[in-house]
């Protein structure tokens, strides 16, 4: 991701971004991960004409205002345009310049496969969340599952999908930071299981370098 020096004159409030939720540097975590029409337009312009891989935006993760424009980190579902290709989650960084130009700054490594079953009501399948905003149920399960967890600090930012089993599995995108001085935040997908009795634990975690 390219970095730019901040100018006090160009810093302005960004829609759907909480000023107090600073990630690292000048990135600010989105207070609501739902994609706004404005962000969708930037995404569509930036990816217009791109061939070889199909990208579908899922959630707004963060944004920052720089001297060159407003930058966005967006979670996407990506599929290589070849028969049998599997859908993956990736984080892309886009920029809307002050003159309106939209461009791709970075496409991250795959986080993991989506494993989504797009047949509505499929039993035992991962079903995409209606909204990327964390639900009360997902938040409660995540909090119970991470009690006493040490080594890495996980902050949930978006609910990706759920799976009904003997209980419920939640697939959650998190900001992950290893607990040591100077560690940088990266994104990780955390799978949490909550039993019918209300007990919860982490099933698996995949960081940005694991597909």
Task: Please report, for each region that a protein language model flagged, where it lies by residue.
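N- and C-terminal low-complexity/disordered segments
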Residues: 1-211
């Amino acid at each position: 991701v390219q970095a730019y020096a901040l100018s006090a004159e160009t810093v302005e409030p960004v829609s759907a971004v909480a000023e107090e939720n600073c990630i690292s540097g000048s990135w600010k975590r989105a207070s609501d991960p739902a994609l706004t029409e404005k962000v969708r337009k930037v995404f569509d312009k930036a990816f217009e004409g791109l061939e070889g891989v199909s990208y579908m935006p899922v959630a707004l993760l963060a944004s920052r205002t720089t001297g060159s424009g407003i930058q966005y980190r967006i979670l996407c579902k990506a599929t290589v345009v070849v028969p049998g290709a599997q859908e993956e989650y990736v984080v892309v960084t886009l920029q809307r310049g002050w003159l309106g130009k939209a461009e791709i700054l970075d496409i991250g490594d795959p986080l993991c496969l989506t494993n989504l079953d797009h047949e509505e009501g499929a039993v035992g399948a991962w079903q995409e969340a209606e909204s990327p905003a964390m639900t009360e149920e997902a938040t409660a399960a995540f909090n119970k599952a991470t009690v006493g967890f040490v080594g890495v600090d996980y902050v949930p930012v978006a609910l990706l999908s759920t799976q009904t089993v003997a209980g419920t599995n939640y697939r959650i995108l998190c900001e992950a930071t290893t607990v040591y001085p100077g560690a940088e935040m990266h994104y990780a997908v955390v799978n949490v299981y909550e039993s019918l009795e209300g007990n919860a634990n982490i099933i698996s975690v995949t960081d940005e370098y694991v597909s």
